[in-house]
Amino acid sequence: IPPAGIDVGAEAVDALQANAAMVRKRWQQLIDAAKTDKQGSTALARLIDLEPEVLVFPRAVEMTIEQSIFYSPKALSDADRLLEIANERIDRIAAGASWAEVVSLGTSNEKQLLAGGYRSKIDDSFQPYGVVVPANVNVVDALPIRMDVWLHGRGEKVSELAFLNKHSNRPDRYRTGNEPMPQ
């Protein structure tokens, strides 16, 4: 059982809960629109496929609130950042973006980090993942490449919020196996 976190104040918690609820509301509006769309089943299937890539973020924030596991004041800004990512992904999905565009995977000369979610086959919940994408990967290239995948396990103070935050910034902290050892 994770230890109790710090008191971050009711006002901050209320603001995060409202922002998480807004993400969920915006997502539901997309689902409802797809149900009435002429191509409803295709549009709805696309949204269902992309749903974990969005809703894993408010879930992480809500779980952190429910379990009172904010371990530093910085975790509040991390939570805000994750909800911003969810909103940006909703905007991209509404614009018809591909999965790669939704998760911001592009061709880059730099390492990239992807953080998102998948739907658990055990309990249908959204579970976080992180992927380290090596530099110089072309998203349309069919050649096999090494990508390191991180799944959230158990940690005394590693909430899903902390996991998603860690795996969505600072790619320099990861080695992809095809680069020289640091000096």
What positions do the PLM features span?
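Amphipathic, heptad-repeat alpha-helical segments
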Residues: 1-54
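Active-site machinery of serine-nucleophile hydrolases
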Residues: 144-147, 151-183
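Amphipathic alpha-helical packing elements
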Residues: 56-57, 63
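A domain-start/cap signature at the N-terminus of enzymes
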Residues: 2-6, 67-68, 72-145
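Sec-exported extracytoplasmic/periplasmic mature domains
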Residues: 25-35, 62-70, 88-95, 153
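Short, charged, amphipathic alpha-helical segments
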Residues: 44-56, 73-84
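Intrinsically disordered, low-complexity coil segments
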Residues: 29-49, 108-110, 121-124, 135-144, ...
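Extracytoplasmic/secreted envelope proteins and their assembly/folding machinery
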Residues: 13, 17-20, 24, 58, ...
